[in-house]
């Protein structure tokens, strides 16, 4: 070949390399906040759905149906079921002892505390895990971290768009239009999804993703045992953030006698300094979780069809499992 031909071949090779890079960067990742979704499935599907031995499987079947619908509607390239290896990490409890304290069923000295969970849901969790494993859907939980932290780390490392499916508003903090990170929040069980992007956050709360951390800790969250700042509700928190920018700006205003804080706001914020100092670390999801090396590609065929067939028969997974398998294969 003449010199020009070699140059053309080299250019073509470079273009192909660029195309491969672009393809890798645009893979759509879907992250499931698994526990929040199977809780919703449990309460959204009648308890009359049973296995042959009488065990309830409403959460299992509801979750499988939900995943099938998610895959069909959003077509992710990669899918991870993120798990709570520790639903109440010690490092968060050390900072705010009330964190999720009301949900502790039993304290465990050398491990995660046992969480209160409905009697007919608890036996379904191992079934959910076994079915996900047999399907080949990546399931990731990391010791000493919540699923939120696993999600935050996966989202932070992603090179393409990310859909986070969760019933936990705390994950609104990860919304980032520039990086294509959005939250799909289930309404009315798991039947309808609210697409949460920056425009929705600003319209609803007046903040962006990172600003939601400041809003949440000021407002507090009884469901997580976060006290918030007394007298500072959601609307007041949003107004303060609009006026002073962020939490640091609000606390600087407490020390500035010329600021436009009301006397009662100044007093309550001043009295809450200890809480405000530690709450960001509790509310903000970790982005540095040591994730295992797993294949996150959406499976087209089950990893263990024999085990899956046995699970389907034992637990009466019937149409729910078949619908998911059909969706994965199309």
Q: Where on the chain are the PLM-derived regions?
A:
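Noncatalytic, basic helical substrate-engagement surface that gates or grips nucleic-acid strands
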Residues: 23-165, 169-191, 197, 276-278, ...
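N-terminal amphipathic/basic-hydrophobic helices that include classical n-h-c signal peptides
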Residues: 1-21
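N-terminal non-cleavable signal-anchor helices
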Residues: 13-16, 23, 166, 255
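Ubiquitous "structural anchor" signal
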Residues: 12-14, 52, 241
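Non-catalytic nucleic-acid-binding/docking modules located in mid-to-C-terminal regions
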Residues: 20-26, 75-80, 137, 178, ...
